[in-house]
């Protein structure tokens, strides 16, 4: 099963190489797509260098900053066009542990969204100030209650989608950005009967 890790970037030149090296060090059968929103700090150029150094790394350059949600939608479309079976969302800033990729992948199957949750047993956050944790927990609680969702961590960005599921979604209609993008995608999964 071909798996693609999507890493949207905007001004990540100081952390991108380390993040890519850590993902590739897991020695999993996967490829990485860096989606750069025309970062002024040189992230796009570094991404190109990394793609030359590592054949399993590709780069999608976008002409302007369009936001996280649009970056992921572009990555989903690219993954579908390239024939990948699964797509993993992963932050380029190192906030998701590459060592958890194997666990995330092992739970994936054709009709399941897998979320690397921070707020379930075994989950945790690292290097977050207390107020960011409070905001995240409160936002998740509010979203779950208002939307009637059983998902414990609706705003988590470390996820694995089957591309067959993504093909059935109206991705061109997804509007939300930031944490709202994760919530909207979670609701789409629920609406389409994804586990």
Residue ranges and their predicted role:
Residues 36-45, 94:
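A conserved acidic beta->alpha catalytic loop
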Residues 2-4, 31, 184:
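Cell-envelope/extracellular polymer assembly enzymes that use nucleotide-activated donors
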Residues 23, 37-38, 66, 75:
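Conserved short acidic donor-positioning loop in nucleotide-sugar-dependent glycosyltransferases
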Residues 181-188:
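Short active-site alpha-helical segment characteristic of glycosyltransferases
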Residues 62-81, 86, 98-179:
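Acceptor/aglycone-binding surface of glycosyltransferases and processive sugar-polymer synthases
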Residues 7, 30-39, 60-61, 90:
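Short beta-strand/loop segment that forms part of the nucleotide-sugar
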Residues 104, 192-195:
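Short, intrinsically disordered, charge-balanced linker/junction segments flanking boundaries
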Residues 12-25:
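Short, well-formed alpha-helical segments that are part of the catalytic scaffolds
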